[in-house]
Structure formats: structure tokens, C-alpha cells
């Protein structure tokens, strides 16, 4: 996994604050230690869909404030038939 301990802490801190009782996964190229670069792809499983867009924007702004301007993609569990959700669940690393 190509996240520093600090990056891991920041992601989980803001996730727990804004999306309690949820599961956050890192997926995509950052899960492969042999690859370089790449954005931070996150998959979030949550049952609480209230104010989801506002909480997503708040999460991304707080993470970028703490980590600097990085490309971060955050997707939610919406439809388990979506290929991206299946890939994230199968190959993702829970944070």
C-alpha cells in the first residue's frame, strides 16, 4: 500500500468524523507497492446517505488541507452491480 502512516491517519480521522460506522477502502494503483504515482482512490461503504454530497465535499477539503493538493477520488456504495464497486470491494485495502 502506497500511503504514508500520516496519510492513512488523516484519511481515517476525517472519515470517522464525517462518516461514522462506515468502511473506507483504498483501491486502484495505490494498493500496488510496485507502481508509482497515481491518485488516491477511495471507496466508502456507509448506510447513512443523509447530506452525502456536503459531507463528501467537507471530507475532501479537510483531507486536501492536511495533505496538500492531491488528486483524490471518493466513491460511495450506491449500486453493488457497478463494476467499480465490485473491484474496490474485491481488491481494495480497508483503512
Question: Which residues does each predicted region cover?
Answer:
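Catalytic core of pol beta-like nucleotidyltransferases
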Residues: 1-25, 31-37, 46-95
Amino acid at each position: 500500500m502506497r500511503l504514508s502512516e500520516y496519510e492513512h491517519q488523516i484519511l481515517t480521522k476525517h472519515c470517522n468524523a464525517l462518516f461514522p460506522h462506515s468502511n473506507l477502502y483504498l483501491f486502484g494503483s495505490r494498493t500496488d507497492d510496485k507502481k508509482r504515482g497515481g491518485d488516491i482512490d477511495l471507496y466508502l461503504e456507509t448506510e447513512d446517505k443523509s447530506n452525502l454530497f456536503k459531507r463528501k465535499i467537507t471530507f475532501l477539503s479537510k483531507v486536501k488541507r492536511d495533505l496538500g493538493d492531491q488528486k483524490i477520488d471518493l466513491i460511495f456504495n450506491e449500486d453493488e452491480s457497478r463494476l467499480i464497486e465490485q473491484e474496490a470491494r474485491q481488491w481494495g485495502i480497508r483503512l
